[in-house]
Amino acid sequence: MSAVLLDGKALAAKKRDELKSEVTKLKERGITPGLAVILVGNDPASTVYVRSKQKACEQIGIYSVLKELPASTSEEELLTEIDRLNNDPTIHGILVQLPLPEQISEQAVIERISPAKDVDGFHPISVGRMMIGEDTFLPCTPFGVLVMLQEANVEIAGKHVVVVGRSNIVGKPVGQLMLNEHATVTYCHSRTKNLTEITKQADILIVAVGRARFIDASHVKEGAVVIDVGINRVDGKLCGDVDFESVREVASHLTPVPGGVGPMTITMLLANTIQAAKE
């Protein structure tokens, strides 16, 4: 069998059309959703991400502001900028592009953003609300994974979901979202002893470890749904954490890289910004 490919690009385009009409309705009420993005330093990957976020905002009519600060910026200067944006009524969402230079504490920055403008869903208050299943801004990549599964009519309730990876940005929250949808969830990570034994039990396998082609067909149960969140560059080409060619022969559904989860991440950021503007 060959897996059904979950096309994140096509789904993102469809969702963005829906979001565009929501923006139009908000504008009719005199509200233009506004997103502020702060970029500290000039990390090439971060610069690319920030540009694509701005372009996506433009396409659907969200007002976006990019604040570029030098790599030498102090933590105090960055926190002052966040305070200013917290108090700016034209800005509904604030995003600080990670990673930050070493003199700045990421946690201090995340906690300084007003929870009402935390469109990345990283503030401890947002995370806590997600844990107890309350309405909140969900982290964009896990939110994108959830929407992809729902749109593909993949049943989550009662299924065994195995998450490989435990980062605060993807691994931990995506497992929590699956638990909120009534799945049984197992986390694996670098200290997990019997990885293959556990991943082979997964009905839904979500991989986010940042290691190229780390998961191959030997890790996957026949008919499992495999979501590849990784993005790695090997010999100048992008690839995921899953060995696409071998896994597509055993999985029932599989996300490609590029064109899988990636386009959904920015789409959910747009959705969160619109939600913030409504509130």
From Swiss-Prot:
Its EC number is 1.5.1.5, 3.5.4.9. Gene3D superfamilies: Leucine Dehydrogenase, chain A, domain 1, NAD(P)-binding Rossmann-like Domain. The keyword NADP applies. It comes from the Bacteria. GO terms for cellular component: cytosol. It catalyses: (6R)-5,10-methylene-5,6,7,8-tetrahydrofolate + NADP(+) = (6R)-5,10-methenyltetrahydrofolate + NADPH; (6R)-5,10-methenyltetrahydrofolate + H2O = (6R)-10-formyltetrahydrofolate + H(+). SUPFAM superfamilies: Aminoacid dehydrogenase-like, N-terminal domain, NAD(P)-binding Rossmann-fold domains. Pathway: One-carbon metabolism; tetrahydrofolate interconversion. InterPro entries: Aminoacid_DH-like_N_sf, NAD(P)-bd_dom_sf, THF_DH/CycHdrlase, THF_DH/CycHdrlase_cat_dom, THF_DH/CycHdrlase_CS, THF_DH/CycHdrlase_NAD-bd_dom. Catalyzes the oxidation of 5,10-methylenetetrahydrofolate to 5,10-methenyltetrahydrofolate and then the hydrolysis of 5,10-methenyltetrahydrofolate to 10-formyltetrahydrofolate. PANTHER family: C-1-TETRAHYDROFOLATE SYNTHASE, CYTOPLASMIC (PTHR48099:SF5), C-1-TETRAHYDROFOLATE SYNTHASE, CYTOPLASMIC-RELATED (PTHR48099). Homodimer. Belongs to the tetrahydrofolate dehydrogenase/cyclohydrolase family. This is Bifunctional protein FolD. The gene is folD.
